[in-house]
Amino acid sequence: MIKKYAITPNVDADGWFIEVENVAPTALYTSKDAAIEKAKQVAKENSPSKLVIYDQFKNVEEEHSF
């Protein structure tokens, strides 16, 4: 089964969440790049997986499969 990861903006503060399987966020990062780097690492370690990266307006910006 493919695990789904997402990078989403934190609307209440300045930061980015890593979410797993559309449940509560697992981590908050101050920079989007740091969140993406960590999410890619975790997604690769838990292959098969999919990473969806959203912009600050919650539009899909990128998708990656591992």
UniProtKB/Swiss-Prot annotation:
It comes from the Bacteria. Pfam families: DUF2188. This is Uncharacterized protein YycD. The gene is yycD.
